From Swiss-Prot:
This is Profilin-1. The keyword NAD does not apply. Phosphorylated by MAP kinases. Binds to actin and affects the structure of the cytoskeleton. At high concentrations, profilin prevents the polymerization of actin, whereas it enhances it at low concentrations. The variability of the residues taking part of IgE-binding epitopes might be responsible of the difference in cross-reactivity among olive pollen cultivars, and between distantly related pollen species, leading to a variable range of allergy reactions among atopic patients. Belongs to the profilin family. The modification Phosphothreonine is found at residue 114.
Length: 134
């Protein structure tokens, strides 16, 4: 399966619930900042933004004072899982990032998608990739 298929079929898919909803944007990005696959709506990011995110995985709390920046959008960092998941909130939407052995799995959402739905979609794929040694 291509990396693009993982984004299209497992991240940008309909989310089960009272109504079917989808993430706003999603991507799989290598630890070095190279994009493996992304939705057409995923923001163009700067290398320093990706460096900050990687630093937060290695040094949990690094982004808390400044916020998480991606594509020029600032998210307030909220409770995640140290070294494994970073979560951010901005208005009625937010972001979930799951770290695997070689990549970061990104999901960006807006209402009516809930933070829990975004977490579920992103972390499910991230856990699968970890099980595959990726």
């Amino acid at each position: 399966m291509s990396w693009q298929a993982y984004v299209d079929d497992h991240l940008m898919c309909d989310i089960e619930g009272p109504e079917d909803h989808r993430l706003t944007a999603a991507a799989i990005v290598g630890h070095d900042g190279s994009v493996w696959a992304q939705s057409a709506t995923f923001p163009q990011f700067k290398p320093e933004e990706m460096n900050g995110i990687m630093t937060d995985f290695n040094e949990p709390g690094h982004l808390a004072p400044t916020g998480l920046h991606l594509g020029g959008t600032k998210y307030m960092v909220i409770q995640g899982e140290a070294g494994a998941v970073v979560r951010g909130k901005k208005g009625s939407g937010g972001i979930t990032i799951k770290k695997t052995g070689q990549a970061l799995v990104f999901g960006i959402y807006e209402e009516p998608v809930t933070p829990g739905q975004c977490n579920m979609v992103v972390e499910r794929l991230g856990d699968y990739l970890l099980e595959q040694g990726l």
